[in-house]
Structures are given as C-alpha cells and as structure tokens.
Amino acid sequence: GILELLKELKAHDIKIALASASKNGPLLLDKMEITSYFDAIVDPASLAAGKPAPDIFLAAAKAVNIDIKEAIGIEDAAAGVAAIKASGALPVGVGTAEELGSDIALVPDTSHLSLSYLESVWKGN
C-alpha cells in the first residue's frame, strides 16, 4: 500500500508533500508512523479556498520547491481530482472511473501505486 510507495519514493529522493483537506491529517500520519516520509504537510486552515480549488496543491508544490507542472497528485475524491487538474499537476486517482472520471490514470487501491507505475503515467502524459 501507501507505505511501500512512500519508502520507494524516499529511496529515490523524490519530494513528497501531503495536501489533505483533513484537519486530522497530521494526527493520522503520526498514528500510522509515516510523518517522517513527508517533506511538507500543508495545513488546510492556512488556505483561502479548499478543494476543488487548486490552492492546497499549489501550496504543496511550493513547500517542496517544485514547479506544479512537474508534480503528480494522488487523490481518492472527485473534488481533489478537480483541484489537481486546476493546479496543473498530473492527477492519479485511487478509485473508480464512476467516482473520479475516466480521463485520468486510475488504480483501484493504493497497493497498485509504485514508482514504476507513476513513471509510466508520467511518460504517457
């Protein structure tokens, strides 16, 4: 699942930012013991607009000092996918086409996410 992906991305020095609208995000990361994998965690309370506005993804890219057009956003909600698209990042959905749309790369769950998968999505973009 997600832990394997985080480890793989870290091993390749790929920047990771969390752009969750959940105010419990940092607490959940601590409970899952994965906070250390993230280079930045965006506080949704610091933003003018929530998803589907792109603000949180733009802030995440800025926090890790990358151009948003060089970013992939992974999302499990339609509003989040819309926000990723609006930001200029490349969306990857976790869920179904009925939930998230058929015009993006989709995986049924996080166990299907890997660096090689994300690279193939990026190259196909």
Regions inferred by a protein language model and the residue ranges of each:
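Short, acidic loop-to-helix structural element flanking the phosphoryl-transfer center
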Residues: G1-L18
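Asp-based, Mg2+/Mn2+-dependent phosphohydrolase catalytic module
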Residues: L3, K7, K23-N125
